[in-house]
Amino acid sequence: MDKSDPENTPIREFMQTDFSRVHQETPVAEIYRSLTGRGCDDIIVCDEDDRFLGIITRMDLLSAITPGMGIRSRRKMGCLECIHKSAALHARDLMTRSHVTVPASATVAETLQAMEKNRHPDVIVVDDDGIAVGLVEMCDIIAFLVREGEI
């Protein structure tokens, strides 16, 4: 079996394409209901043209559910971000807008560099139009490197 080179292997060869996606106008109540059937995965938020806008993380959900606990502020009083998210009506109100993205043309090595630079264990893969086409988690890359005998 030939080994794949992480410097040249496109990330799209093993990115996850089956991920949760909602539009920015999706009601928060609908998002919570959808979690009961499939678990608490991160949720990609898109605009009307399916362009990537942000992500709803587990921490975003926690902040919205527990504003009085101040999870993010480490105080018993609610943090401002938590209080704001607890009043969220739509996905756009709850999402984290800044998230690491890589182009669909990125290699495994480039994706690892983006993760390391941003100190984040997952990235969203976007096409040339900014549409989210995939998700790559650190464990996906580790599995690839193990299969290829790199680690």
List each model region and its residues.
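Tandem CBS (Cystathionine beta-synthase) repeat/Bateman regulatory domains
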Residues: 1-151
